[in-house]
Amino acid sequence: MEFTTSSRFSKEEEDEEQDEAGRREIPFMTATAEAAPAPTSSSSSPAHHAASASASASASGSSTPFRSDDGAGASGSGGGGGGGGEAEVVEKEHMFDKVVTPSDVGKLNRLVIPKQYAEKYFPLDAAANEKGLLLNFEDRAGKPWRFRYSYWNSSQSYVMTKGWSRFVKEKRLDAGDTVSFSRGIGDEAARHRLFIDWKRRADTRDPLRLPRGLPLPMPLTSHYAPWGIGGGGGFFVQPSPPATLYEHRLRQGLDFRAFNPAAAMGRQVLLFGSARIPPQAPLLARAPSPLHHHYTLQPSGDGVRAAGSPVVLDSVPVIESPTTAAKRVRLFGVNLDNPHAGGGGGAAAGESSNHGNALSLQTPAWMRRDPTLRLLELPPHHHHGAESSAASSPSSSSSSKRDAHSALDLDL
């Protein structure tokens, strides 16, 4: 491990630091050099040592200006020439991991080291080293990294400052990534070799899931199945089931006022809107939800008509009473009779009720005004006398009078 107290990083001052480090501050370099076999020449003159030191410094300085101790740190073969050509596999001891926070990779340009790990692996005498120490690390590719390690009294924390921002930028670290620190195993020289590594955070986000808060779009494609009403080759639209409550409400609020009736002149098209299906609709059992309103459009001579559908569109629902014998509803200028016996046969009554609720639409529904406005424009009750003659019942006179007044005139 190399400890220096200088904060100068120019080229000339860096060379002076390398010379001083070779004599004083890297003891494991001299130990390794003594343990290595001597070259062919046994000369130990100062000139020979100076030449070998300068050759080692020039070879290491050509790759990066901070590679002052990689002659011994990378290969462990001393500072002699040719030692850096061999890549030695070093056994490492894991020290600790640090999950970087947004402030660690932000604009503060510092990495906070947990106090328990800092005091255990990087002991620092703040009084003797006011400016901190320079720690040399190697990454997985063998590239050296130098960080200034110091203690901040203001926050009472151990931090790595200078050189850390360059590491974050090159490795593209983000908040949540993990930085791992380890050291070599073996003799004194191996234990002074420090290594740094990193790994990306585990991405648990589902790429197919939409971000929270964004509206869910309707499916762009729908599945079509043959629909057997009329035998005209129509299709039944089967939308996918709603995935969320928002999509369910979105489908309820669909509006088909921009529908082009000319495109539906040659076939039957089934649309779904926001009204409710009446309970007497046996042909619409395949509807995806009882909250959808289905009706069909067929071409006709005077416009688009709703053919064979028991759906009441944009009108006041007719509430059947078991005490009434007959009802007449005037919708869109057409009188519709709905005879229904109080206790008569269920099948015949249901069939007649289905035929009675079928509407012929003279104009498309999307070209009319809002039905809530039409309710406010009901005509005066001047047709009650004409329509009371159409209601007949074998019950008492009071019942006949009540039936006559129950006939609705919705001349829309």
From Swiss-Prot:
PROSITE patterns: B3 (PS50863). GO terms for molecular function: DNA binding; DNA-binding transcription factor activity. One of its GO terms (cellular component) is nucleus. Residues 1-87, 374-412 are annotated as: Disordered. SUPFAM superfamilies: DNA-binding pseudobarrel domain. Keywords: DNA-binding, Nucleus, Transcription, Transcription regulation. InterPro entries: B3_DNA-bd, DNA-bd_pseudobarrel_sf, LEC2-like. Residues 30-65, 387-399 have a biased composition (Low complexity). Residues 96-200 bind DNA. Residues 400-412 have a biased composition (Basic and acidic residues). SMART domains: B3. Residues 73-86 have a biased composition (Gly residues). It is found in: Nucleus. Disulfide bonds: none annotated. This is B3 domain-containing protein Os02g0683500. The lineage of its organism: Eukaryota, Viridiplantae, Streptophyta, Embryophyta, Tracheophyta.
